[in-house]
Amino acid sequence: MTIMRKTHPLMKMVNHAFIDLPTPSNISGWWNFGSLLGVCLVIQIASGLFLAMHYTPDTLTAFSSVTHICRDVNYGWLIRYMHANGASLFFICLYLHXGRGIYYGSYSYMETWNIGIILLFLTMATAFMGYVLPWGQMSFWGATVITNLLSAIPYIGTDLVEWIWGGFSVDKATLNRFFAFHFILPFIIAAMAMVHLLFLHETGSNNPLGIPSDCDKIPFPPYYTTKDFLGVVLLLAFFFTLVLFFPDLLGDPDNYSPANPLNTPPHIKPEWYFLFAYAILRSIPNKLGGVIALVXSXLXLALIPHIQTAKQRSLMFRPISQLXFWLLVSDVLVLTWIGGQPVEPPFIIIGQIASIXYFTIILVLMPIAGIIENKMLKW
């Protein structure tokens, strides 16, 4: 008798994706982040669903409904902090996952990489709209500043901004539509993650050596299910330490004040995971130039497969490219720090230097390093 998981139409799909899946025998802990992102998405959708049951997307009651969740709903404070810190955890895993893709040359799988970039943009959009919903000071002013950037688009900019706002300023209509989009986007992310997996399983996983591993594959369970489970346990330990002991560590105190259109906070800034892009935006004095740089900061990832010059796929045995990669990581950390600082000397010039360095490393240094390494290996 044939096994049901190999014959049943639905089970067969799951079987090919998770059970009878040949996997390279040497993939390291850096390959855990895909499954960890799946766990983060489940946490976010589950906690978000319970929050949506008690939240009201109205300018008069949004802030007090969040307060009500924290004070009156059973374990509402826990659900709210899980959702808020779950977003931070999601982005930590997302950036590490993308960094691993750059380091080990996973961008060679073009379809998987491009879907991953779309997933990054969708997640950023979802997180931005979610940050607006509590209707605190930083929610309101963050929404005003970021949506206003679209007015830099020539000719249609102003009309586009008013169309998104649903009026002449960020108001009830804006909050309502942001709530609707924030609710639907995670399900689109889940669907896109399925497509991401579909393309990945067409080619099979990459490995740290960046070489074909068809001659040395092992089954996914029990080896990598155990490994993924360990990753999930460590992730949840870190997550609940954050949620239960330091719930406001990554938040902004200004968001505990209700939104007031008549009072601007001294320093408007987004959540920490957008600070690197925000620093790039601020470092260009021209509005349209800043918006272009902001979009290009994440779009540059899509260029990496097209501008890579090295004959070796992974950076494991390429010390010059490794140097450029870790310079890029350091640069992103500097940009994140600068994004949270006020716009005054010396932070302005540091931000401008770091922004130039960011694009130079990705577009110039990495390809040059690849060419030099090819020459050194006489390829």
Curated annotation (Swiss-Prot):
Binds 2 heme b groups non-covalently. The chain crosses the membrane at residues 33-53, 77-98, 113-133, 178-198, 226-246, 288-308, 320-340, 347-367. SUPFAM superfamilies: a domain/subunit of cytochrome bc1 complex (Ubiquinol-cytochrome c reductase), Transmembrane di-heme cytochromes. CDD domains: cytochrome_b_C (cd00290), Cytochrome_b_N (cd00284). One of its GO terms (cellular component) is respiratory chain complex III. Heme b b566 binds at residues 97, 196. It is found in: Mitochondrion inner membrane. One of its GO terms (molecular function) is ubiquinol-cytochrome-c reductase activity. It is a multi-pass membrane protein. It holds the Pfam family Cytochrom_B_C. GO terms for biological process: mitochondrial electron transport, ubiquinol to cytochrome c. A ubiquinone binds at residue 201. Disulfide bonds: none annotated. Its cofactor is heme b. Component of the ubiquinol-cytochrome c reductase complex (complex III or cytochrome b-c1 complex) that is part of the mitochondrial respiratory chain. The b-c1 complex mediates electron transfer from ubiquinol to cytochrome c. Contributes to the generation of a proton gradient across the mitochondrial membrane that is then used for ATP synthesis. Heme 1 (or BL or b562) is low-potential and absorbs at about 562 nm, and heme 2 (or BH or b566) is high-potential and absorbs at about 566 nm. The cytochrome bc1 complex contains 11 subunits: 3 respiratory subunits (MT-CYB, CYC1 and UQCRFS1), 2 core proteins (UQCRC1 and UQCRC2) and 6 low-molecular weight proteins (UQCRH/QCR6, UQCRB/QCR7, UQCRQ/QCR8, UQCR10/QCR9, UQCR11/QCR10 and a cleavage product of UQCRFS1). This cytochrome bc1 complex then forms a dimer. PANTHER family: CYTOCHROME B. This is Cytochrome b. It comes from Dipodomys ingens. The gene is MT-CYB.
